[in-house]
Design a protein with these regions (language model features):
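Glycine-enriched alpha-helix->loop->beta-strand junction motifs that scaffold or abut catalytic
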Residues: 217-219, 245-251
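Short helix-capping segments at alpha-helix termini
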Residues: 106-112, 138-139, 219-227
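Divalent metal-binding segments
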Residues: 1-132, 151, 156-208, 229
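Catalytic cores of alpha/beta
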Residues: 241-243
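Aromatic- and carboxylate-enriched substrate-binding clefts and catalytic-loop regions
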Residues: 228-239
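Non-cysteine beta-strand/loop elements that form the S-adenosyl-L-methionine
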Residues: 141-161, 249-251
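Conserved helix-loop functional segments at active or binding sites
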Residues: 191, 214-222
Length: 251
C-alpha cells in the first residue's frame, strides 16, 4: 500500500517504498528526481506535488461537488468571498477541468461564494498554455474571477527549503531550493507583462526575493502591463535592500 505523509507547510513529505516505486513511474520523474531521497523516502518541493500524479484524477462532476461542499462550509462560517490557488491541488493536476468546473458552476448560478482564483502552476509551459488559451487577470463571471498567475519560487523555513543567500545555521551547506532559474523567471515575467497577466510569487527566503526583483526589473514589457502590480507573497526573510528593490519595481 503506498503511503505518504505531507508536512503541514506542503513543502516536504515522506513516503514508503511502495509510494516511491509508483512515483518513479510517472513521466515527470526525471524532472523531480533531485528532490527525491530514494534511501529515506523524503520528498521536497515539486516532488511533494507530483505524488498526486499516481492517484486517480477526479471527474468534473466530482470537482464541482468539492467546490460546492467547500463553499457551503465557508458560508456556514459567514464567509461570502475567498481566494485560493486550486489549479494544481487535485490528483491529475488537470487545471482545465478545474477551470471548467468553476465556469460551469458560475454559469448555472451554483457558486454560493465569490471566488478569486490565484492561478498556480508548477511548470512554465503550463503557465504559458493557460495564458495562450485566453485567460487573463480580471476576467470574471458573476461569482468567479481570474486572479494573478501564482508561482512558487522556493519552499519553507520549517522544511529548510526556503531559498537563502546564506546557509542555514543548523544545515551546513544548505541554502534551500529554487523552483525556477533566473533565466526561467526572466522569461516568465516578460511573458506575463506582454500578455497582460499579473503575477504573485511565493518567496520565503531572501535569495528567492532577489530573483523575483531582478526578473521584474529585466522585463522589457513591464510598462505595457495594465493588469496591476506584480507581488511577492510572504516576504519572510528580508532586508532594507530587498524592500527598496520591491519599491523600485513597484512590487
Amino acid at each position: 500500500i503506498p503511503i505518504i505523509m505531507v508536512r503541514v507547510c506542503g513543502h516536504v513529505a515522506v513516503c514508503n517504498s511502495c509510494g516511491l516505486e509508483l512515483l518513479k513511474k510517472i513521466p515527470e520523474f526525471p524532472e523531480i528526481e533531485k528532490e527525491v531521497d530514494l534511501d529515506t523516502g523524503l520528498l521536497k518541493e515539486n516532488a511533494v506535488q507530483f505524488y498526486s500524479s499516481v492517484l486517480e484524477a477526479p471527474s468534473q462532476e466530482e470537482v464541482e461537488d468539492y467546490i460546492k461542499y467547500s463553499a457551503k462550509k465557508l458560508n456556514e462560517c459567514g464567509f461570502t468571498g475567498v481566494q485560493s490557488d486550486d489549479l494544481a491541488s487535485l490528483p491529475g493536476k488537470n487545471w482545465r477541468r478545474i477551470m471548467a468546473s468553476y465556469k460551469a458552476l458560475d454559469a448555472r448560478g451554483e457558486l454560493s461564494i465569490r471566488h478569486y482564483e490565484q492561478c498556480l502552476f508548477e511548470r512554465a509551459e503550463d503557465a504559458k498554455a493557460f495564458i495562450e488559451e485566453g485567460y487573463r487577470t480580471g476576467q470574471r463571471g458573476d461569482h468567479f474571477t481570474v486572479g494573478p498567475m501564482k508561482l512558487i519560487q522556493d519552499g519553507s523555513l520549517g522544511a529548510r527549503t526556503a531559498a537563502m543567500n546564506e546557509p542555514y545555521e543548523d544545515s551546513p551547506g544548505n541554502t534551500g531550493i529554487i523552483t525556477f532559474s533566473q533565466e526561467e523567471l526572466d522569461d516568465l515575467f516578460a511573458f506575463f507583462d506582454r500578455h497582460q497577466m499579473q503575477a504573485a510569487v511565493h518567496c520565503i527566503g531572501d535569495r528567492a526575493m532577489d530573483m523575483v526583483i531582478e526578473a521584474a526589473a529585466k522585463s522589457p514589457y513591464r510598462k505595457d502591463n495594465k493588469k496591476g502590480r506584480h507581488g511577492i507573497v510572504h516576504c519572510q526573510i528580508t532586508n532594507p535592500r530587498i524592500l527598496q528593490g520591491m519599491k523600485d519595481q513597484d512590487l
